[in-house]
Structures are given as C-alpha cells and as structure tokens.
C-alpha cells in the first residue's frame, strides 16, 4: 500500500477570499475602517462568512478524489481576534463538510 502524501492547504488568500470580505465589512460598517485599517483581521466575525475563491472548492475536491493525498488545513489565528479560529472552523465545515474534521493545524507564521 502506497502512503499518501500530506498536503497542507492555507485558508486566507488561498481558499478564502478575505480581501473581498474586508472590503465588504468596511462598506457595511464604515465606522470600523479607521479603527481596523492596519489590522482588519481583528474584526470580530470577519472570518465566519467570506466567500471562497473561484475554483478553490473544486481544486480541493479533485485533490481529495485523487486518493493520493492526506489533506490538512494550515492557518493562523490573529491574537487580537480570539473568535477567528472558531469562525474558521465553522467556515471549513460549511464549505467542506467533514473533509477537514480534526485536520486543522494552527500556526502564527
């Protein structure tokens, strides 16, 4: 039996279109723009509902269906936004179901 290669997939900027979500937040909540202009990742709730990049879901599906890879998520969670990690976990479940269940690695680098 061939051992599957391990692949770590980043969330922000790879799967998750966080740039568009930040723009949407600042448009909907202009009072937040000045406070969070240098650290928008500290906005509570920012990581819960962003859209995935076009093609991201299909790319993960193809990797999974190939049977060649053990897929994991590698992401970071800003210290100034402790809810972000929970939001990211919910985001993964919403878009991928059980694909990344207990397969989320958090780092700050």
Feature locations, PLM:
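Short His-Asn-centered micro-motif
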Residues: 9, 50, 74-76, 107-108
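Residue-level recognition of the N-termini of beta-strands and the immediately preceding loop/turn
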Residues: 5, 69-71, 102
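C-terminal cap/substrate-recognition subdomain and adjoining C-terminal extension
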Residues: 82-109
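Short amphipathic alpha-helices and their capping/turn segments at secondary-structure boundaries
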Residues: 1-6, 58-62
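Glycine-rich phosphate-binding loop signature in dinucleotide/nucleotide-binding domains
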Residues: 2-3, 66-67, 98
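Active-site neighborhood of HAD-like aspartate-dependent phosphohydrolases
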Residues: 2-47
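Substrate-recognition element of Asp-dependent hydrolases with the DxDx(T/V) motif
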Residues: 51, 56-88, 92
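Short, flexible loop segments at the rims of nucleotide/cofactor-binding pockets, characterized by
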Residues: 47-51, 97
